[in-house]
Amino acid sequence: MTKPYVRLDKNDAAVLLVDHQAGLLSLVRDIEPDKFKNNVLALGDLAKYFNLPTILTTSFETGPNGPLVLELKAQFPDAPYIARPGNINAWDNEDFVKAVKATGKKQLIIAGVVTEVCVAFPALSAIEEGFDVFVVTDASGTFNEITRHSAWDRMSQAGAQLMTWFGVACELHRDWRNDIEGLATLFSNHIPDYRNLMTSYDTLTKQK
């Protein structure tokens, strides 16, 4: 049976950045490190561009998982920041769940490290509580492709939608006429080839 197309709505969405920690990032092998960090920061930038409530959380950061990556702290200095003392599933942490529910949003855009644990566990828990969950696959990382696909299968079968940060941005924006320069700048900052495209566009526009 075909599932209905549930679109992301910028007025009903929140972003959850789960366990993007220095130690855990060293485990990511299914995406090249530089590309992965770029994707994570791109997701952060689109959250700011669309004014989406954003929640940061870490797990056992005083241990080997390490602290939240500095760039995310810098992006969201005033965002709710839940340092979980030991809960592996972020949804098992009362403060985290309270912060999520306090946004008043039904759609949750989730990314994190590692995919099959730090993303999958809260995603499945949120679905069980009636949220629409959108997993940002290229801003989530894990050990290898086998592990990644196992996590994707589990989440998608439970009802999560798997998307990329670029797809998320486009679906939230809906129409280029809403803001050409703003969205193009977001893309250009994180996709080198898109920067070339916009340079060409700007040149042609100025010639008219």
Predicted regions and their residues:
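Glycine-rich phosphate-binding loop signature in dinucleotide/nucleotide-binding domains
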Residues: 99-106
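A generic "binding-loop/recognition-motif" signal
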Residues: 20-21, 115, 168
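Short phosphate-binding loop-to-helix
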Residues: 86-98
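Acidic, metal-coordinating catalytic cores used for nucleic-acid/nucleotide bond scission
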Residues: 60-63, 87-90, 115-119, 144
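A short acidic, amphipathic alpha-helical/loop segment
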Residues: 68, 95, 121-125
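Active-site acidic carboxylates
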Residues: 1-86, 102, 132, 149-156, ...
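Short, acidic/turn-prone active-site loops that include or flank metal/cofactor-
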Residues: 85-88, 138-141, 168
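A contiguous pocket-lining binding segment that forms or flanks enzyme active sites
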Residues: 107-165
